[in-house]
Each structure stands twice: as C-alpha cells, then as structure tokens.
C-alpha cells in the first residue's frame, strides 16, 4: 500500500542517490577493511533508514510493508553489508517490541532505535538450536524482582554494535519445544553479558556476527517483553514472517544490480570480433536473469500489499523468501559466467556479490524450512 506517491518518490530518490554516490563507491573499501565507516552510518541515520518501519510517534517513518520493500529494493543495489547495519533496527531487532512490547518499553526504546542511537539485535539462534528454534536452552530463572539469564547465542548479527538484544530464553524448563520460551529486552551493558569475537565469514564483510554469552546476566523483571511469560516463540515467528518479505526485497535489489552490471558488460566486451551480448547463449543467460528478477519482484510486491491489507501472508512470505533467495544465487552465478574470468577477479566486484548472496538461503529460515512451512500450510488449508 502506497499512501502518498510523491512523498515516497522523494524518499526513494534520496535513497537511490545515497546508494549510487556514497555506498557503491565505498563497497571495495568496506569489504577490505571489514568495517563500515562511521560517517556512512551517520548519513544512514540522517536519511531515516534506521526507523523505516518504526511508528511515527516514536520518531520513525512508519512505512507500509510495500513502501518498505520498495526502499529495500534500492538498498539492495549496494553491497548487502550496508543494508545489514540498519536491517536489524528495521526488522528483527525492533519488530518484536513494536508488535508485543508494553507502552513503557516502546516509549523508552523505539525512539532510540528509530534515530540510530541504539542498534538492536535479535538473539534466537544457539549452538544447538538453528532451524529447530524451539529447542533453545538459554534459561531465564525468576529471582524475586529480576531474571537471571544463562546460555549462549550464536551468529548474532550486529552483536558487537548492538545496544539492545531481544533475547529468547526458556522460562519454563518443564515445557517441551517452543512452549515455555519468553522474550526479553536485554541492554548490551548488562553485567554477565559478553560478546564474542566476530566470526570470519564467507561474505558480507563489513558487518559482523558474534556469539552472545549470558553468564548469570541479571535483568529486571520489567525486561520481559510484553506482559506474559511463554509468548516468546510466537513473537519470534511473527517477527521472522515479516522479515522474510524485507529480505526477499533485498535479494531482488541485488539481482537488479547484478543484471545491470552483466548487461553493461555484455554490451561492451568483445570476442570473436563482436560484443558478447550479440551471442545467443549470452542473451539466454541475460534473459533468464531478467525473467527471474521480474518474477521475484512481482511476488514481493504482491505479498507486501496483502500484508498491508491485514491478510495472512505466512505462506506468501515463505514463498518469497524461498524463491528470491534462491533466485539471487542463480543470478549471481550467471553474472560470473557472463563476466567470464573477470567475474572471478576481485577488482570487478562480481565475485564479492557471489559470496555475499549465499547467506540469504540460510538466515531467517533456510530454504528447506521455507519449503516445510509452505507445504504444511498447504496441507493445513485442506482441513480448515
């Protein structure tokens, strides 16, 4: 749903210029140094990128799902490392608070998240709880007017930059699976919370994932997200469902960048006395890339519009995440093929995108988990 096309166009134009003038020229430096300059993060905050999804009464832009996806399409044209900086505040790091937080929790944290003053992280995954998120072992034991948290969270995006963690922990050890899991708002400076060394990753250099270790970390009882224990897993699933649309839009944006780069290269690279774009086999690759990009974009916009109409989009979100994350991997592979040997060389940047996009098939639900969700929902609809 687009509420005011003129205002949205102004936002998209600003993001588009920022991507082309500030982010793309700094991609190689960020990848080499494995860090994003503070000056760029400050400009992201000035553009309002940290608060895209946060309600206006807390200082955010409160974009609709369709509007947010259109912005994500533009951000996706730059290295995904840049988008990841703001991505947790837009999505998994803030949405649990927006959806299920108490008024006092929202009043304190959301303005700080919207401005970029605080970066948030979503601490669900554990060493033995990846796709099986319901098997988390991190515990939260009530002790008077506080909780004591113990456990280790793994592969937590932006952990070393975060000022706030939404931590999923088990408050009822007797409950099986996802039952008995609660969500907590845990400040980074909490005694007993430590951050591990950033992992060495295949791609998306510039943003970091780390372990978050909770060793008798004491938080006030008021840090429980919402008002009831045992609602954490439900919150997590709602957050991830929404986040899959955003991630899908980012995948489509990256595919768009790779298609543009590949088409331009095919139009100027000469072999056998002519540009390679005149060869039908190269044209076939370009056509396949464009067709899949268009299909992915159409899926994302359709699902986003349905969500804006308050329709249930659990299946559609998983369809988008599954197709778009796989699609951008195929597009990146074809881009390397179009570039030939140059696509394998770092100077051209194509090999970097090839590595960067591999994670999209893994985080916020692997492709195989998306298949399970889609199929189970299809079968469930038969009995509804």
Which residues are covered by each model-predicted region?
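Alpha-helical interface subdomain recognition
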Residues: 1-78, 82-88, 100-105, 112, ...
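Short Ser/Thr-interspersed hydrophobic loop/turn segments at strand-loop and sheet-helix junctions
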Residues: 48, 72-76, 169, 186-191, ...
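Short glycine/proline-enriched turns and hinge-like loops at secondary-structure junctions
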Residues: 63, 132-134, 158-163, 177-180, ...
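Flexible, glycine-rich active-site loops centered on histidine and acidic residues
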Residues: 94-100
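A short, Trp-centered hydrophobic/proline-enriched beta-strand micro-motif
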Residues: 116-124, 168
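Hydrophobic, small-residue-rich alpha-helical packing segments that form membrane-like cores
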Residues: 129-132, 147, 154-156
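Flexible, small-/acidic-enriched active-site or ligand-binding loops
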Residues: 135, 189-218
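A short core secondary-structure module
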Residues: 150-195
């Amino acid at each position: 749903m687009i509420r005011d096309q003129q205002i949205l166009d102004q936002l998209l134009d600003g993001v588009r210029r920022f991507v082309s003038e500030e982010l793309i020229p700094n991609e190689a430096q960020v990848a080499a140094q494995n860090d994003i300059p503070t000056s760029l993060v400050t400009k992201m905050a000035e553009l309002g990128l940290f608060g895209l999804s946060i309600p206006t009464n807390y200082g955010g832009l409160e974009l609709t799902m369709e509007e947010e996806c259109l912005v994500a399409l533009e951000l996706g044209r730059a290295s995904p490392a840049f988008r990841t900086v703001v991505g947790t505040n837009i999505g998994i790091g803030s949405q649990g608070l927006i959806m299920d937080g108490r008024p006092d929790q929202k009043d304190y944290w959301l303005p700080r998240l919207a401005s970029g003053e605080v970066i948030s992280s979503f601490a669900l995954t554990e060493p033995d709880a990846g796709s099986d998120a319901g098997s988390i072992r991190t515990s939260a034991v009530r002790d008077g007017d506080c909780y004591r948290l113990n456990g280790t969270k793994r592969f937590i995006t932006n952990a070393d930059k975060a000022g706030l963690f939404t931590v999923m922990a088990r408050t009822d050890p007797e409950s099986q699976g996802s039952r008995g899991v609660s969500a907590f708002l845990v400040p980074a400076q909490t005694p007993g919370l430590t951050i591990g060394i950033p992992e060495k990753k295949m791609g998306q250099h510039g943003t970091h994932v780390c372990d978050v270790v909770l060793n008798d970390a004491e938080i006030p009882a008021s840090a429980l997200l919402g008002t009831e224990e045992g609602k954490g897993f439900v919150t997590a699933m709602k957050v991830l469902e929404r986040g899959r649309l955003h991630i899908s839009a980012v995948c489509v944006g990256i595919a768009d960048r790779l298609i543009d780069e590949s088409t331009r290269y095919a139009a100027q690279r000469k072999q056998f006395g002519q540009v390679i774009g005149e060869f039908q086999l190269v044209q076939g690759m370009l056509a396949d890339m464009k067709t899949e990009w268009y299909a992915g974009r159409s899926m994302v916009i359709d699902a986003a519009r349905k969500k804006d109409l308050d329709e249930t989009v659990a299946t559609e979100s998983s369809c988008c995440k599954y197709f778009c994350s796989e699609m951008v991997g195929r597009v990146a592979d074809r881009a390397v093929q179009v570039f030939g040997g140059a696509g394998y060389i770092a100077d051209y940047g194509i090999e970097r995108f090839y590595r960067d996009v591999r994670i999209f098939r893994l985080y916020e639900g692997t492709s195989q988990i998306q298949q399970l969700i889609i199929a189970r929902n299809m079968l469930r609809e038969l009995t509804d």
